[in-house]
Amino acid sequence: MKKILFLLLLLPLMVSAQTYKYIGVEDGLSNRRVYYIQKDKKGYMWFLTHEGVDRYDGKEFKRYKLMDNGEELNSLLNLNWLYLDHENTLWEIGKKGKVFRYDPLRDEFTLVYKLPEDVVKDRPAPISYSFIDKNNNIWLCNDEYLYLYNTHTQQTLQIRNEIEEDITDIEQIDETHFFIGTEQGIHHAELKNRALHLLPCDKLDNLPIQINELYFHRPSRKLFIGTFERGIYVYDMNTKRSTQPRMSLTAVSITRIKPLNN
């Protein structure tokens, strides 16, 4: 009897089932094409779709328009990245170099920065990748220049892209060091004195692969590298070695790497 009671008491602790719910356009989602999903500290789910930004409170959707001088921006070149920074501020960024910030007091997205006309006039998509670092900088990247918009000072720093390749992903290691993935490989770089400096790293420099996704695990100082049709690589900063796990998913394209339960 004691054994049975013991098992029954433990049962609630052992069961941790997840609840999943399908939501789609019939529930109010503005479009079936969803490019990014974020969850803020209030529990709202934010979806960047082909129509704009949707917020879901668990019951219903609310759609937000992205406006520039009275014109709604709903083309694919303006709907590319949806980020939450370390201060829980929501940002939407497009390949045309326009940056929107969500204003919770006015409950709307406000255009806070856009690239100068002389930068965008000859390039329909002047930005190949955007990234928010822990120094409050929004990176707007192409193969020639990096435009760093500081969200606190509203100042923009233009620096030369020393890699001279289209950037596909960035992972920040510490205050000044970054891993930068491109369509040709991966690079170790330092952002210092208003310039990007490439640092030698033979185990990465000699890895000619197209990078889709980077994830840096700080406790182990390991970089997980998701590639296009080459599976996963792992670079250990402690041993300076690059390896492929036994289950490397060779010939598979890796588009996202996320830690479990995070």
Model-predicted segments: where are they?
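Carboxylate-rich, polar loop motifs that coordinate divalent cations or form catalytic acidic clusters
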Residues: M1-N262
